[in-house]
Amino acid sequence: MTAFTTPSAPGLSRRALLRGGLAGAGLLTLAACRSAADTASSAASGSAGPRRGGVLTVGTGVDFTPSLLFAQSANTLVQRLVFNTLTRYDDRLQPQPELATSWQLAADGTGITLKLREDVLFHSGRRFTADDVVFAVKNLQNPARSAQLRSTAATVTDFRKNGDFELTLVLAHPVSNLFDLFEFMIIPDSATVEDAVAGTRLVGTGPFTLTERKPGSSITFARNEKYWNAGRPYLDGVEIRIVPQAESLLSSLKTGQTHLSYSVRGKDVAALKSDPQFRIKQYDTGSGAYYIGANLTAEHVSDKRVRQAIAWAVDRDRLVQQALGGYGTVSSVPWPKSSPAYSEAGAGRYSHDPDKARALLKDAGLTTLTLPFAHSNEPGATAIAQILQYDLKQVGIETVLQPTDSPTMQKQLISQTMPALWTLSHGFAQLHPATLAVSAYPFNEARNSSHFSSPAYTDVVQKAWNRPDSDSPEARALYQQITDVLLDEEFVIDLAIAGLVEVAGSKVRGVDLNKFGYLNLDDSYLTA
């Protein structure tokens, strides 16, 4: 995504958190705004407004990986179809009600009391209660779930129930990203959670129920007739089709077999932009940042001069234009422009300068070297890897490309078994800045994919995280220190910031994504 619509997203001030009791009104306002927008859009297309019925088909290049249900992975389309979260962010990172209707933060930031909806049923017919929130938090605390926000979930040390629909979470210390956890944490059914991670059964409280899963082919869902959001969903069902070939995905969109996709290659999106059959939407979440990762246990890349040389070698502008179709912003830092951690100086720190790259390699005693370079075997990711391979070759760094399927790469990230270099995209910078450094596998100060460790990095990250605010001058100063470490050490070499790009057929309305890319179809419908 090129940029946010606002120069900076406000942090979660104590006042904003304490007025959570008014958030229900905010939810109604947002729903009204969304309905108004959809109505206006429908009027323009000759439709009378929201229409019940129909099955929405979604095309994606990567299959759903059930074992990563509770982690951020390459396919997060399923989560919000089947499940709900406690709260959801609006465009200004202000939490709005979902399963939690209101909240009250303790004055010292070490606890939060949640009031919960009383009209929610799981797909099995069981009533949702505070016990399910307790289970959801403990589920993310389980290391087996590989949840990136496990560290934030782990700050919850006690649960105090006041009946079935009020719960206080007691925290070990204040954290600046508590509502990031609530946006991320889906509420599963405790009785079937092991079936969920095995991919045999998904039971939640969400708008759709799983009807069939064909691994590598498709996943189908039917409307939840007992959904708590009255009158929703409009759709009869949803089918997610796995289409790994870029040309096949593009063809299925053009022929109308697929209504919606977030997996279209940048160059194909650019070609569709002027086609009236499609509506192109950039999500201004900055939820994806393309990067090169370095495994510091590997020969040569353990020297930060080599990593800095790589940062100077890459032509980021060409990468954005050729591989992303112009849908991205060149950046040396992970932060989108909306983040309180963003600065123009940081974003522009590394530009395309092959001479500087060669000089750094020479300082490191190298003129040429050969390194393994892993990348996702999806077409778009392969195109990015090939551009990077060319740039590195120009300064004397030969790379051997290692195409790998996305689930395997995710497991390698988690297990710290990446080769010397790899390229992927990361999230978590679109939220409160501390979340990136305590949650994202490439950046986690305690245990990251690069095997990077630094007392200074750990200290500043913990200071930024262990505070109730995220946007004060003191917090911003800590974010700058984190950025300084990242730009100097370059164990993660950021290249470009881009959000998801939605390609939708002209009949599709009301689609939304949350900050983690969970597909929300509560208000979606197909025009006649």
Model-derived segments and their meaning:
Residues 398-403, 407-409, 438-505, 528:
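Extracytoplasmic/peripheral linker and loop segments enriched in polar/acidic and small residues
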Residues 129-136, 164-168, 206-207, 235-237, ...:
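Alpha-helical secondary-structure segments
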Residues 59-107, 138, 203-204:
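N-terminal lobe/hinge region of extracytoplasmic solute-binding protein
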Residues 115, 149-191, 212:
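Surface-exposed binding/hinge segments that line
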Residues 325-363, 380-383, 470:
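Structural transition elements
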Residues 56-59, 390-444, 474-478:
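Periplasmic binding protein-like
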Residues 94, 182-233, 237:
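Gly/Pro-rich hinge or "lid" segments in bacterial periplasmic/extracellular proteins
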Residues 226-271, 398:
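Ligand-site clamp/hinge motif
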